[in-house]
């Protein structure tokens, strides 16, 4: 029975013979022309296929005996497979356990084999212990004691496996070689008999703890031998790549491990072969680059993705993908952009370019991004949209906006050079912002940030120069800037500052045709509209300062041009309606002008009442305008809003009182009508004068005849 079991064992283990690692063992069946393939003749020396699980050659006779034994074992193995793998366990009696009577530690101590597995394997006492175990088995057929079981119980599967492979390469005598060979076979058979999967053996060998150094560990040979044994016996399709990928925790971890392994001489060859196998597997499975990006967990944070070493794995995959798919030209930057979006990629690269540790990589990827856009036939306008500059330029961090502007500018240069185009950054921005008005406004907002100021000022200058070269008048630029929508909008629109910039440049080139912002506004809207808007705006806390400055400029402009009060009255188109409630702004402006006029010309003073009275055509027309306004204010409950009408009424009625005109004489002396035929407004004038007259008369009487106490 013992000889029979040995034959079966020999059959089991001989099926494990073969190459240790090659691309056919690691990779998917589909070849990849861009990846180095390891043929048998190119496999590393330490992985040569003839180095495992063969009993060393001695004599021709012994070889013949071994061949006969092997064939017998294989035949028996075939029968076993047919009847079920479970029966194999019945023939194998080499499980890793200690004797029932003595613990493994005690046995090793007796034979002085407990001072390290390496020493134990080359100790003469190993043979003595082997004989002892064989004797136990002979005396007690139920004994499960085995040398490999005792060693494993004390030292562990991983330490024993590693030491056996190492010893196999260093022992000298034929007996020692045979002993190591038997122990290695015994270890494999013990795992098999206890239904250990290849994944279980990976765990037993503690390869995960070795990280990338596992690729150079002798334990890797043991894992590969066991995997081949399982594949032969079970007709399995397990590969070293799959086993390691599962064992190390997935493809992302495996990819990182292989990258690290490629950096070291002792692990480079196997790491390269396994990486090629991994890339081939993905290509065969028809994964798109973005899918591999997700597999490598580069899809969660772009900045981290750029610093993650597995980005090199993705880059390598893209090269293989393009070779296998000539019609598709994927790129690393294109894959990132497809997942994260062009704008986010640009933002992160701008930030990374300011970090000394990532600057070089960021600049290279920035160049790749420009090339990717060009290869995909992107226009300058499309790149503007991709970068979302319309939203970003006036609203976000100036440094980021500046970086995006520079990126767009560089793309335009590349586009013009490669496509013989004539695009400009200014033209692209103008289109992107739907016109010069929006662009100018965005540039004004962005110029306050020191990071973007230089680029923004440059663009402002180009826009101004473009208008100057066209010979545009300031009023035309006013329209280009969208300042022709009404004076109220002008005062709150920042583009008035851009118009001021243009006027300054215009004046510097047109010395004999100089103008100003207030003159430009007046030329477009009219003095009266501008004056009214400025007077109203002075009551708005947000616009008061701007309105006051512009109003002062308007008044001084009239003065410097020699305008009289009558001229300004005419310019302002003052009429009866200017006395109406909430409508007296132009009369107030006239009063401000007369005050300034009198301040400048103290020798000749102008009386505002006289100017207004004369321009209205005398007392009657002025009285009709003033009383009409007062009546409307009473009807609308707005008496407090007609202060200027009240002042003119008091001044007018005061003159009549001073001329001793009694109320009953107003019809005939002032209005030139018969009282019976007077209209409602004329009767109202008389009524209001009567009230005024009585009040003034009462005051005069009280002063002349004070009441005695």
UniProtKB/Swiss-Prot annotation:
Positions occupied by motif RxLR-dEER: 51-66
Main location: secreted
Signal peptide: 1-18
Cellular component annotations (GO), alphabetically ordered: extracellular region; host cell cytoplasm; host cytoskeleton
Subcellular location as annotated: Secreted; Host cytoplasm, Host cytoskeleton
Entry's induction text: Expression is induced during host plant infection.
Disulphide bridges, residue numbers: none
Keyword Manganese attributed: no
Keyword Signal: yes
UniProt keywords, alphabetically: Host cytoplasm, Host cytoskeleton, Secreted, Signal, Virulence
Coiled coil: none
Domain notes: The RxLR-dEER motif acts to carry the protein into the host cell cytoplasm through binding to cell surface phosphatidylinositol-3-phosphate.
Family: Belongs to the RxLR effector family.
Biological role stated in the UniProt entry: Effector that enhances P.infestans colonization of Nicotiana benthamiana leaves.
Name of the protein in question: RxLR effector protein PITG_15110
Biological source species: Phytophthora infestans (strain T30-4)
